[in-house]
Amino acid sequence: MRVKICGITNLEDALVAIEAGADALGFVFYEKSPRYIHPQEAKIISKKLPPFVERVGLFVHEEPVKIDEICSYCNMSLAQIHFDVEESFFEKLQTKALPVVRAKCAEDILQFSDRYRLVDAYVPEFGGAGRRVALEWFENIDCSKIVLAGGLSPKNVSEVKRYGFYGVDVSSGVEARKGKKDPQKVREFIQKAKFE
């Protein structure tokens, strides 16, 4: 199962995550988030990362042109679209994109079922809230294109492995405080998600 550590705000946290085995790092380009990072800072961090690490820019209520501009400037390899959009929105993007399904009910997780997508619990504040999607919603469905997010931590990530998710995405579950990761929690989360 692949692992994305989201809400990276500094190089130290990025390197700890990569060393521990993270497949992807998430950078939040949403100014209202406590994990917001200025594109200039993200670019500096991105340049210092080793190859073969996915760099994901998270966006809320941005136009495709602006998303492409920031992703290009910061060397992001993927744009995570963390707001409700139609399929046509993705056609306007030059950057490869991952839609986010903010699920309120079981039917919601079937949105964008023909493509890779991130499924998170619906919360008004757009992520990082630690709210969890009901796992029973994933019974008897193909989860191989789903990245699960929301309410994950080193204590519970092992529970989700049996569903066959493509990956998991964690932010608040591995923090010492908002915007700063706890290295021990990061290592423990990745160990349990990938290697146990």
Swiss-Prot record:
GO BP term, example: L-tryptophan biosynthetic process
Protein keywords: Amino-acid biosynthesis, Aromatic amino acid biosynthesis, Isomerase, Tryptophan biosynthesis
Signal sequence, renumbered to the chain: none
CDD domains reported in the protein's UniProt record: PRAI
Reactions it catalyzes: N-(5-phospho-beta-D-ribosyl)anthranilate = 1-(2-carboxyphenylamino)-1-deoxy-D-ribulose 5-phosphate
The organism's place on the tree of life at top rank: Bacteria
InterPro entries: Aldolase_TIM, PRAI_dom, RibuloseP-bd_barrel, TrpF_fam
EC numbers on record: 5.3.1.24
Amino-acid biosynthesis found in the keyword field: yes
Pathway connected to this protein: Amino-acid biosynthesis; L-tryptophan biosynthesis; L-tryptophan from chorismate: step 3/5
Molecular functions (GO terms): phosphoribosylanthranilate isomerase activity
HAMAP family found in the cross-reference section: PRAI
Family the UniProt entry places it in: Belongs to the TrpF family.
Descriptive protein name: N-(5'-phosphoribosyl)anthranilate isomerase
Record organism: Nitratiruptor sp. (strain SB155-2)
